[in-house]
């Protein structure tokens, strides 16, 4: 087992070009810390009213972990630019579930005698249009969404997309649907993401129309891009941000929740509910080893944020242009060099994605095949979804992505073996 694990490690870390956009490589420091002593410890804790809202730990030997959690919260608040963060969730999906559970509990806070009412209309990105599973009725939203009495299906309304660009939200049509359905929750965020989400425009609209909704942004794929090179969600009007910490962010595989509520705000009670739906609602042992590694990752991100993020956007746009120049069908808007994120998407023909992804893997290029918005599902996947974040961390620059694009075009279009190159 050790031999095979080391063999696999060397292959992925030293011999492959890793282009899966939901993956990254943590630093050696993050890996080391993630496997240190806290990895086998417990540190359950919560704020107790009888102890004047102080954090009370249920185990001894946790003073170091207490310090780590406080420092991590401080670093993540600085990174997000928000008032409160929860770092105990173990994944983006768990983060979303904690938020959905809290929203449902908050909705029913004045009626504890009757069966809890589920969330009314929720707006999100359709899964075939790039939406993430964790924001779908078939995923994390399943137990918290009401049934539409007209359709007898989950009360979800999907964002409409532009006719000439199915990867981009149609803002004006979205406003019409918001006005019609008056959703309780609006969830931005996608797993197949080429564009910024129109957070500021939708925030302005719901405020003007006095629609009492909560705006949430699931930033799992773009968490490491928060800032001036991409989006500042809280400045634009998001109330809640969730995400996983290992895609564009530098961390081990964990989750995080941030909110921008102040103690004097009515919705600060929702934040307190999010905390309680995290622990004890969602997790007992919150994996102290990777939480320690996450602190180092947060230090790294806050130190190198500007250089990393600018390189990501620059490399993604350059990679997309190069792929197009070598004859591949790059999707998206050419006016913005096809992407505003770390992702680049190439159409390879109906149902051809899996075979071409396997061909590339045989040549040590690792990609992710996906269905396009025009295809009926994953089995018909005709696209390759790629990200530049991991190879940017390994030091790739625009010239390297241009060389890679040329080799990939040879492999995809002409069937040439490129492994030796």
Task: Give each language-model segment a name.
Residues 1-71, 204:
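N-terminal glycine-rich, Lys/His-bearing helix-loop that initiates the first secondary-structure elements
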Residues 9-15, 42-46, 51, 183, ...:
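Short acidic (Asp/Glu) and glycine-rich catalytic loops that position anionic groups and cofactors
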Residues 19-23, 300, 342-349, 392-394:
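Short, well-ordered beta-strand elements within core beta-sheets of diverse protein domains
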Residues 19-21, 277-285, 393-395:
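A short glycine-threonine-serine/GTX helix/turn-capping micro-motif
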Residues 64-67, 71-329, 388:
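Conserved PLP-enzyme active-site core in the AAT-like
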Residues 74, 110, 314, 378-421:
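PLP-dependent enzyme catalytic core of the Aspartate aminotransferase-like
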Residues 258, 345-349, 387:
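Short hydrophobic/aromatic beta-strand micro-patches
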Residues 293, 298, 309-361, 366-382:
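Conserved small-domain helix->loop->beta segment predominantly found in fold-type I
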């Amino acid at each position: 087992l050790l031999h095979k694990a080391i063999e696999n490690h060397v292959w992925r870390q030293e011999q492959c070009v890793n282009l899966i956009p939901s993956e990254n490589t943590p630093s050696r420091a993050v890996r080391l810390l993630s496997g240190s002593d806290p990895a086998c410890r417990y540190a359950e804790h919560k704020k107790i009213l009888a102890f004047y809202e102080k954090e009370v730990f249920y185990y001894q030997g946790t003073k170091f972990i207490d310090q780590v959690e406080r420092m991590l919260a401080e670093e993540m608040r600085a990174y997000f630019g928000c008032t409160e963060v929860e770092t105990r969730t173990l994944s983006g999906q768990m983060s979303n579930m904690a938020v959905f559970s809290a929203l449902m509990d908050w909705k029913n806070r004045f009626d504890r005698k009757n069966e809890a009412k589920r969330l009314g209309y929720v707006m999100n990105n359709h899964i075939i249009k790039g939406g993430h599973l964790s924001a779908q009725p078939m995923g994390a939203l399943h137990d918290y969404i009401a049934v539409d009495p007209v359709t007898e299906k989950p009360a979800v309304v999907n964002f409409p997309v532009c006719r000439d660009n199915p990867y981009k939200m149609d803002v004006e049509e979205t406003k019409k649907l918001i006005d019609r359905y008056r959703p309780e929750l609006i969830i931005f965020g996608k797993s197949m993401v080429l564009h910024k989400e129109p957070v500021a425009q939708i925030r302005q609209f719901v405020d003007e129309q006095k629609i009492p909704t909560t705006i949430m942004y699931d930033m799992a794929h773009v968490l490491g891009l928060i800032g001036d090179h991409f989006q500042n969600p809280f400045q634009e009007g998001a109330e809640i941000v969730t995400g996983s910490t290992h895609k564009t962010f530098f961390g081990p595989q964990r989750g995080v929740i941030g909110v921008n509520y102040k103690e004097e705000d009515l919705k600060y009670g929702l934040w307190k509910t999010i905390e309680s739906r995290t622990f004890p609602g969602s997790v007992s042992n919150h994996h102290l080893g990777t939480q320690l590694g996450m602190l180092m990752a947060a230090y790294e991100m806050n130190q190198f944020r500007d250089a990393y993020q600018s390189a990501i956007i620059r490399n993604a746009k350059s990679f997309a242009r190069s792929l197009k120049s070598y004859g591949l069908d790059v999707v998206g808007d050419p006016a913005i060099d096809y992407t505003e994120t770390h992702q680049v998407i190439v159409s390879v023909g109906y149902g051809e994605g899996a075979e071409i992804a396997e061909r590339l893997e045989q040549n040590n290029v690792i990609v992710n095949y996906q269905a396009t918005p025009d295809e009926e599902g994953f089995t018909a996947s005709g696209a390759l979804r790629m990200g530049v974040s991991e190879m940017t961390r390994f030091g790739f620059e625009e010239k390297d992505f241009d060389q890679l694009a040329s080799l990939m075009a040879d492999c995809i279009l002409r069937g040439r073996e490129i492994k030796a190159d």
